[in-house]
């Protein structure tokens, strides 16, 4: 590996560090307020009007009949 390739690799690694710092959302307070906890999805393929709210948290993969139930459980 030439020195110029090594230099470019170092720049890429150093520039990706701030992105990793903000990944969890705890380092920047504004990102916590804008974070969406639940996503509306279609619950039944036969009935397109039947929607559920599914939790987007990594540890919880549950869906609820209402968005308020989903938000209440996903906050924990």
UniProtKB/Swiss-Prot annotation:
- Covalent S-S links between cysteines: 38-54, 43-74, 52-70, 55-63
On tissue specificity, the annotation reads: Expressed in flowers.
Q: Where is the signal peptide?
A: 1-22
Q: Which GO terms describe its biological process?
A: pollen-stigma interaction
Q: Which domain of life is it from?
A: Eukaryota
Print the keywords alphabetically: Disulfide bond, Signal
What protein family does this chain belong to?
Belongs to the MEG family.
Could you identify this protein by its name? EMBRYO SURROUNDING FACTOR 1-like protein 8
Q: Which source organism? A: Arabidopsis thaliana
**What would be the name of the gene that encodes this protein?**
ESFL8
